[in-house]
């Protein structure tokens, strides 16, 4: 029996079995099939800009970090323009513990005093950012490490929260978050230049604001601001969980803006998931592209999400589901 006769068989399992009889490997067949199936997605996304927020387990696990770097280089080679925005909360915690300093979080944001800000800037801009750029360059890319301060890339404004100390009255108090900011303005010139080049921007979320003050800005918020400013086709946020879950803990593969807002209001989405959902909501409301929250613990999760029919995590949509 000739191999070309085997390939006429419409049963995929039989084809794989018979290929092995001819000295082949089922993994080869599956790899070729996946490459073939990815063609429509590659054609669709070529020339588009993707904002990818990188953090969590994908950053802490060295093998996952190397996989991520290779995937970013592959996207660039396929004609896609990836822009990486990274966090680094666990590494910041590690350094704060060395000086016996604890952090307080409000709605997923770290209250940042002057001492904490020094640690944040040192860790994000000096350690984490350079490690990511090195991994991408080692994988064959041309990554450039930046932060929001560089070329006035991202200007921030101070964040303040209001809250009611006593629910029985309407008196609101202001919580000073310290040097915590939110994106106010994005200078797109540098990033548009990089879109036309071989460079891959890797951005740390440390930004400047009024009176030359430095602000610690949540990486999810920075990623969202860049997605809106650049009219990116996709915002993809890697995290430590499978995606957004409902009140019973079930994964939601798709969620509307209104349902996402309800999860926040009801306290079902909490802690670090709040800025992630808020960012996705804002991006899809602008109508520029789609927003995804995916599980960074899965090897090559970016490729699975983008180039196969087996999407992962949660997609936030500006429609009712």
UniProtKB/Swiss-Prot annotation:
Cleaved signal peptide residues: none
Site (Transition state stabilizer): 53, 276
The protein's Enzyme Commission number: 2.7.2.8
UniProt protein name: Acetylglutamate kinase
Listed GO CC annotations: cytoplasm
Family that this chain belongs to: Belongs to the acetylglutamate kinase family. ArgB subfamily.
Positions that bind substrate: 88-89, 110, 216
Keywords: Amino-acid biosynthesis, Arginine biosynthesis, ATP-binding, Cytoplasm, Kinase, Nucleotide-binding, Transferase
GO biological process: arginine biosynthetic process via ornithine; L-arginine biosynthetic process
